[in-house]
Amino acid sequence: KADKEFEIGFLGDSFTEGASVTYEDSFVGIFKSSTKKDVANLGVVSYSPKIYLSKINYLLNEGYKFNQIVIFIDISDLYDDSFYYSLNDKLEVGENSKRGKKLFIRRILRSNFPFTNFYMYVLKNLNKKEEVDLKKINYTRPTFHKDAILKSIWTYSEKDFIKGYFGSISENQKKMMNTMDELYKLLEKKGIEMSLAVYPWPQQLEYDVENSEQVKMWENFCTDRCKHFFNFFPYFFES
């Protein structure tokens, strides 16, 4: 069972997976190369806390062993967790909406038919009706896609109810932290340490503050739970 034993397992979404780079160039690959530790990259695009819990539960039941799990909580996790996913009593992930079903289809295409998925992406973007007027672009300020704005706005919006979200932001925060608490208890029962890491999106650098709601909620959550809390917001705000 040597191939099922790891010092550290990294959990997260596409940022952790390193979707646009080779494994060696991902931060997990760089960490493994520099530390020589036996690590597993468990990150996959569009993952969020409900899937973190489900995946770890599955891996532990399959006999995988870890000394520590490090979870890179993404800004989009709150939206994805509340909008797309549900969990049953067996900790199995299901779809939470019609959009959720589309997300599962995209993940299947990406994993099993990468070229088909790529060409669908290209065709979709080529057929967009809206034309971009390059003369009207303000090159001194960043331009963000509406989906990215929607998923990131909760950390700096003063509203508790935001159009496009299911339920209130505060209620979704509580649900997400409850899911993460379940994950913590599952790991603790197996003698596995848990650490969390947070990092900003470009939208946070433009509209949010260094001591973001994302930082405060997870730093508070980590009290008496985490081995380490890694806050990467200061590094990005300084640069």
Q: Which residues fall in each region the model found?
A:
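Serine-dependent acyl-ester chemistry module
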Residues: 75-219, 232-238
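Hydrophobic anchor at the start of a short beta-strand
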Residues: 39, 194, 229
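Short, surface-exposed linear patches
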Residues: 30-34, 61-64, 91-95, 216-220
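Anion (oxyanion) recognition and catalysis
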Residues: 33, 188, 223
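Membrane-embedded segments
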Residues: 1-71, 75-79
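A generic structural signal for ordered secondary structure
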Residues: 9, 67, 177, 226-227
